[in-house]
């Protein structure tokens, strides 16, 4: 089998996993994203997962499987935020897959966000994808962004209690946050629940997927608010990480 045919078969497998298939324009945008990441990676170190199935499985499938629920409603206009976006993922893959959504991507590292801004421009997504260079703790306290998102997502940014403090304040009362996790166990769940009790949040669902090609197991933890998140969260820059909310004495500012 030629490499091209073999790859076509693997690509089809990815969409089968998602029970969703991109339109020709979306597929073109995913291909363009791969090309642009490759180009930018030569200038600054953005990600090592760019070629072949490193990109299609470990980036695209890994970004999209946790939002399978949203993929079923392509026409819904939703407001999404990706915190700690790094090279632009999972946010850019989600923005391409949900063409009526508006997405905000945040990272505090300027060299990453300036590359991601250029990528957004090249992909033709400027009208509905906004890139911010900022600490999540500051964005989460701004009226413009607080309680304004239907979906808040984060992959590989921090441990669950820290992530919950970053994500919950962004949610509308009906919104949900999705934490993309590699490993997940009862201890982590217990720690997350402790943090959520302070943030007035709850766990809605926990899903898992074994990525193809033995790329490991992934978990998606969906959380939401039970009532409005107390105004003191997220705490000042660096505090959520230094004193995570699962720790009894952590709540002193
Ligand atoms: C390991 S990278 C993950 C990037 C991307 N989400 C992915 O899955 O490939 C974590 C990113 O989160 C950003 N980050 C972590 N804590 C942050 C904070 N408090 N405010 C803004 N960005 C943060 C870092 O700058 C880094 O780019």
Swiss-Prot record:
It is found in: Cytoplasm. Its EC number is 2.1.1.-. GO terms for molecular function: rRNA (guanine-N7-)-methyltransferase activity. Its main location: cytoplasm. InterPro entries: rRNA_ssu_MeTfrase_G, SAM-dependent_MTases_sf. The keyword Cytoplasm applies. SUPFAM superfamilies: S-adenosyl-L-methionine-dependent methyltransferases. S-adenosyl-L-methionine binds at residues 84, 89, 136-137, 155. One of its GO terms (cellular component) is cytosol. The keyword Signal does not apply. Pfam families: GidB. Keywords: Cytoplasm, Methyltransferase, rRNA processing, S-adenosyl-L-methionine, Transferase. Signal peptide: none annotated. NCBIfam families: rsmG_gidB. Belongs to the methyltransferase superfamily. RNA methyltransferase RsmG family. Specifically methylates the N7 position of a guanine in 16S rRNA. PANTHER family: S-ADENOSYL-L-METHIONINE-DEPENDENT METHYLTRANSFERASES SUPERFAMILY PROTEIN (PTHR31760:SF0). This is Ribosomal RNA small subunit methyltransferase G.
